[in-house]
Amino acid sequence: MKFLRRNKKLKGISGTVIAIIVVIIIIIAAIGIYFAMTSHHPSAPTTSTTSTSTTTTMFTTPPNTSNPQVLMQLVGLSSPPSTPVTITVWDSYSSSENQAFNQTLAQFEQEFPWIHVEVTYGVGVGTSQFETAAKAHQAPIVYRDTSDSGGALFAAGLVLNLSQYLPPSVFKLYLPTAIQDWTLNGSVYGLPDNINYIVMFYNKHFVPYPPNTTAQLIQIAEEVNKTYHIWGIAYGASDEYGYRFAAWFAGFGGQIFTTQNGQIVPALNSTAMVNALQFWYNLTYVYHINYLAPSTGASGAEGQLFIANKTAIIFDGPWDLDAYLQALGPNLGAAPLPIVSQTGLRAAPFIGSTGWMISTPQASGATPLQIKAALIFILFVTNYQSDLRLWEVAHDIPANVQAYNTAITQLKEGKLQPAYLNQIMEGILEQAQYGQKFPNIPQMAYYWNSFHEYASEFFAGKINAEQASQGMEQAFVQALVQNGLLSVVLPPPPIFLISYALSMLLVPAVIVSEIKIRKW
């Protein structure tokens, strides 16, 4: 009888243990499911190409890419091929940049008569035109765009991984900042021809000395408005897509991305975004010192007002410098964006880069020989002479290390002509100390429209700053989810709630079971 009671008691204990084990297994399974759902996501996709690599190992030091024979050796050619080859090129340069590029192009075809270059001019940067052509297998063989747009194309498998074609020593020819802009997951997908960012251009006739803080900016703009009856500032925040506004967002303490549970996620819905939006709203509608221009750049309303002496301050990049130089001459000034008085932080523009990429054979239909010719071309148009020519003709900031050092030497020695250009370029180069890295991850492609839609509604008075901040982040997140760049993040608490609920259901059953056994 005692044996039977002991046996039944052991059965009760074993039942309890089994039930507890079941609960533990369920909890572990729940945690496993959670991490499976939140960890499998493409935060920064890698790409590969099936094309044949031509990387050589003979160049351990940076090669002389101004030497035609060296360029052919870099792509595995010992002599010019007997059959001529044609490469198609999409060019996104401005008119002043094209003056320099056309000189470089003429020199290239003289050095490489077996390569014929068909150029399409005036292609806009950051457009979907290339992607559409690539998916139809009709992309140009060579394409010039910004590093962030290029990153999205590389992640989509539409442009070559140059690290598989060129030795690492080649990439040392460029400024580290510039080549990093063209690197994703350790792979280089383009060769930079400049570095760029926005600065504050001002008319010295109205503003003898540039503001260092936003408080000074407001004060100066009010004085200009009152004294000269022109706009103190022309900044069309409602028209842009967040390229220039990112500088002010950073100045108020914001950042476009953050990381949650290992995922790259948008961080636009923040106090920093609300304050940055409200700042420019106040300058426009409360102080009446900013003109909300309907178009940006030298050819837009902002630039035209500046050229016509109808506004004292604008925010633009060196790519439009030539137009402002011609109009204002020695009255043109350039300086870094001011410190945001509320935070003590500099307004920090994107430090980005433009450069040259090569389409995959699948995107363009290029033959192996055309790929070699394309590699020679992008190496040539980013070499020392070509990059220095862009600096001297269009005032682009060189990405080539040797050209950059020459430009700095010219600047320090005051050799730029006209003489007042030296001070202007000093102000432009100073801005590089206060910038932020331009995100080149695929997620960045979905920032622009998200910002534009809700910033436009905000400045039109349809929504408030909080609603704009929330709306642009929601749109951003939705776009990332739809394009497979973000998985729906499940917060940890539900797992523990589920586990707790299951344990509450099962543990009473254990107790009841044990009680029944004891009664038996």
Regions found by a protein language model. Give the residues of each.
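Conserved N-terminal structural module of periplasmic/extracytoplasmic solute-binding proteins
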Residues: T54-A152, A156, T343, I463, ...
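Glycine-centered hinge/linker elements that transmit conformational signals in sensory
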Residues: I220-E223, G262-S295, L325
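Long, aromatic- and glycine/proline-rich binding clefts that accommodate carbohydrate-like moieties
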Residues: A335, E392-E453, E457
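Hinge/lid segment of periplasmic solute-binding proteins
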Residues: N67-S79, S147-V199, Y209, T214-I220, ...
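Secretory targeting signatures
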Residues: M1-S66, L490-W520
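Short, solvent-exposed loop/beta-turn-alpha elements that line the ligand-binding surface or hinge
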Residues: L77-P80, S163-Y174, G254-A276, Q326-A327, ...
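Extracytoplasmic/periplasmic substrate-recognition and gating elements
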Residues: H116, V286-Y287, L325-Q402, Q433, ...
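A structural signal for short loop-to-beta-strand junctions that line the ligand-binding cleft
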Residues: T132, A139-I141, S169-H205, T343-P349, ...
